[in-house]
Amino acid sequence: MISTRLARAGALAPKSRLFLGTRAFATVGDSPLDKKVEMANTEKGNYINYKKMSENLDIVRRRLQRPLTYAEKVLYSHLDDPHGQEIERGKSYLKLRPDRVACQDATAQMAILQFMSAGMPSVATPTTVHCDHLIEAQVGGDKDLARANEINKEVYDFLASATAKYNIGFWKPGSGIIHQIVLENYAFPGGLMIGTDSHTPNAGGLAMAAIGVGGADAVDVMAGLPWELKAPKVIGVKLTGEMSGWTTPKDVILKVAGLLTVKGGTGAIIEYHGPGVTSLSCTGMGTICNMGAEIGATTSMFPFNDRMYDYLKATKRQHIGDFAREYAKELREDEGAEYDQLIEINLSELEPHINGPFTPDLATPISKFKEAVETNKWPEELKVGLIGSCTNSSYEDMSRAASIARDALNHGLKAKSLFTVTPGSEQIRATIERDGQLQTLEEFGGVILANACGPCIGQWDRRDVKKGEPNSIISSYNRNFTGRNDANPATHAFVASPDLVVAMTIAGTLKFNPLTDKLKDKDGNEFLLQPPTGEGLPAKGYDPGRDTYQAPPADRSSVNVAVSPTSDRLQLLAGFEPWDGKDANGIPILIKCQGKTTTDHISMAGPWLKYRGHLDNISNNMLIGAVNAENGKANSVKNKFTGEYDAVPATARDYKARGVKWVVIGDWNYGEGSSREHAALEPRHLGGLAIITRSFARIHETNLKKQGMLPLTFADPADYDKINPEDTVDLLCTQLEVGKPMTLRVHPKDGSAPFDISLNHTFNESQIEWFKDGSALNTMARKSGAK
């Protein structure tokens, strides 16, 4: 059920059994919050400041005089100015002080290059870098890792030396996926973290507000500046009942994605609550929060509970769990807190779901999936099943998957489809190796990949089908846009729980329902797979495996960060030019994008990841995946000056060489997907002025602003249809003011009379400074130079 009215937590959600005691406003008294509790075992001197958070909440409560959702509590407890900050959900821009920053290696390169240009000796906020994106899956874990270390040596050496220089924790290649490492080591209840990856919200499984951002936002926080976020609305998801059988936490978010769609969470935090929460493991809650990125949510969160305490204890952080219990009344929603929208899901009635193909919000319950395959003529044969990724690679996930594989092996069966396994971290890999699940999955036919992102982000040297050949794959990943996993636009990629992935690889077909359909064993006897089983936490504790962490040295003065001037992978940054103070007249439309334009379309990953530290080289992939509304083709646009069709980046470079600015016209939810700021840096670098769309995804809109570009939306979305890609336009930049529309004057290609289109924007005063100065980094440099 979905309710779009303001919904009170107390009225619609009975008191949770997460903890005994009151859920009202009561604030925490003296002593307990004065303790010095470090936020991570890998660091010294970085403390959890529940006392400051509590004081901030007291100030905000006196001002607002109303109950708060849990999401609001975490954000407002991190306000830079709780006394003076304007607070209105969906409208105000909050200036916040995050506790931590986390960066993955593909985005960390540009973030660190930008931080270096700010001229500071060390980061002002605890920061870590995680090497997980640059390892291509080819033959298997150790060999793929060795190959990656050789190919990416220049980048890894840069990151290792830069993190040592600037007091940043460094997780080496093979350590695991950023979000699993964060959950195991850095996430803590009530904390606020930003990360340069869109699936940063994974840490919501430990009651943390963890938000994906672009590298420029990360640089601000690393430099000690407050971070700005438009105050999100809060969508409540009340969970009742209890999961059993084949239903998993993944099915909760697959269901929610189907209800809210890929843009339904934009501008909102998804807050889970209700008695059903207690039936979920901590890592299961992480799974749900992780994939909230697919519905555009700012982040997703669960309230602190005993399952989280158990996980903290299992990961050698019981002291943090004990401290959180002292602050527990503020680690959940207030009685009577209101949500902007409420969804109710009964876990006892929830079916396993499969989402896809080509979009993560096309949700189908397993009971109707066979019919959907037939109706839509999706390729029935299942070519590959893939489990793991940052979304589903916990001990519980691997244990349940192994139980299904063992059931099949006991009946003389193995995987009929190709099958891969991606452990989420070295700790997970070592633990499931010790406890036997890894051997079971290998015996079943699984190829164990490196502890890294791999096929989930397109780092997959797939060779079993030809490019352009229609085929089906199913994974426990989070994202399944066209061509994302294997660069084959004809691959039908489906997303499900690891349990369903393993079951379907046994049958080798999409038309298999393990809840009802029988298999034949080696002797031809029919049998039904048993529902999966698996412990949420290892009974023998976690095995840390190989040591893959590099702490910053005590003396950083002698560390040098070298970037070769001839490198094709790393390039020191030059500042962007400031705005010239004039309207832009007679400029071309580089491309009018038709339909879905994700960050994968704007700046592809896969083989392009190696250029993430070299802005000019990676700009050669700008918008090559976007479909041109003029001709229905990708990477084919008409040059206004030559009349010839050419690649999008080549055309943009020609315009830049002529000193001509250009704009892009986009469709709905432009820039959905990952947090990669290259999708904003590239158009800025190649001379772009504005991106004008029906609507934007949140992170991409902010990234464009940070780089001195104008993200603008049609006041009337139907005006998108009035523009011909060969028209020229005037953009009246001098009209840029807070809360006021801007004008786009269109000069039609056919010579008919010009007409005006009204454009909206979400710039505030400080963001307008970014545009005028040329970028947020330029503004930072200007202000620091003036001090």
Swiss-Prot record:
Induction: Constitutively expressed on glucose medium and increased expression on ethanol. Its cofactor is [4Fe-4S] cluster. Disruption phenotype: Essential for growth. GO terms for cellular component: cytosol; mitochondrial nucleoid; mitochondrion. Binds 1 [4Fe-4S] cluster per subunit. InterPro entries: Acnase/IPM_dHydase_lsu_aba_1/3, Acoase/IPM_deHydtase_lsu_aba, Aconitase/3IPM_dehydase_swvl, Aconitase/IPM_isomerase, Aconitase_4Fe-4S_BS, Aconitase_4Fe-4S_dom, Aconitase_dom2, Aconitase_mito-like. It catalyses: citrate = D-threo-isocitrate; (2R)-homocitrate = cis-homoaconitate + H2O. One of its GO terms (biological process) is mitochondrial genome maintenance. Residues 529-559 are annotated as: Disordered. CDD domains: AcnA_Mitochondrial. The fermenting yeast S.cerevisiae has 2 aconitases, ACO1 essential for the citric acid cycle, and ACO2 specifically and exclusively contributing to lysine biosynthesis. In contrast, in respiring filamentous fungi the ACO2 homologs (acoB) seem enzymatically inactive and the ACO1 homolog (acoA) is solely responsible for these functions. Catalyzes the isomerization of citrate to isocitrate via cis-aconitate, a step in the citric acid cycle. Also catalyzes the reversible dehydration of (R)-homocitrate to cis-homoaconitate, a step in the alpha-aminoadipate pathway for lysine biosynthesis. Belongs to the aconitase/IPM isomerase family. This is Aconitate hydratase, mitochondrial. It comes from Aspergillus fumigatus (strain ATCC MYA-4609 / CBS 101355 / FGSC A1100 / Af293) (Neosartorya fumigata). The gene is acoA.
